[in-house]
Amino acid sequence: MIVRTLDECRNSERRVVSDNWESVRMLLKDDNMGFSFHITTIYEGTETHIHYQNHLESVFCMSGEGEIEVVGGETYPIKPGTLYILDKNDEHYLRAYKNKEMVMACVFNPPITGAEVHDENGVYPLVD
């Protein structure tokens, strides 16, 4: 059994911070569950280009408001209770509205190791 708290993960190397977001990676590849689980905060008033070419992701909004724009497609509002699934490695822009940082629960498959960072194309590489 694995038991962790958000606070203990937040105060460890499992917390990754960037200009637009921070992610607390509570479950990673080395936990051998076949997926990873993160609590990610998207900072208010930001836009982040993301294209997970090597991973599928499902995201549940717990708080805040924003939108996701699929490149070449539609834009969808995000608010608490919204689930979106990037089941086709969708290239997208994620925006958190001003005064509305978003807190999201995220699941990745394959799981990430925790060492990944977005490259210039918004991609996480596959890392062993």
Curated annotation (Swiss-Prot):
<dbReference type="InterPro" id="IPR011051">
    <property type="entry name" value="RmlC_Cupin_sf"/>
</dbReference>
<protein>
    <recommendedName>
        <fullName>L-ectoine synthase</fullName>
        <ecNumber>4.2.1.108</ecNumber>
    </recommendedName>
</protein>
<dbReference type="Pfam" id="PF06339">
    <property type="entry name" value="Ectoine_synth"/>
</dbReference>
<dbReference type="GO" id="GO:0019491">
    <property type="term" value="P:ectoine biosynthetic process"/>
</dbReference>
<comment type="pathway">
    <text>Amine and polyamine biosynthesis; ectoine biosynthesis; L-ectoine from L-aspartate 4-semialdehyde: step 3/3.</text>
</comment>
<keyword id="KW-0456">Lyase</keyword>
<dbReference type="InterPro" id="IPR010462">
    <property type="entry name" value="Ectoine_synth"/>
</dbReference>
<dbReference type="GO" id="GO:0033990">
    <property type="term" value="F:ectoine synthase activity"/>
</dbReference>
<comment type="similarity">
    <text>Belongs to the ectoine synthase family.</text>
</comment>
<comment type="function">
    <text>Catalyzes the circularization of gamma-N-acetyl-alpha,gamma-diaminobutyric acid (ADABA) to ectoine (1,4,5,6-tetrahydro-2-methyl-4-pyrimidine carboxylic acid), which is an excellent osmoprotectant.</text>
</comment>
<dbReference type="InterPro" id="IPR014710">
    <property type="entry name" value="RmlC-like_jellyroll"/>
</dbReference>
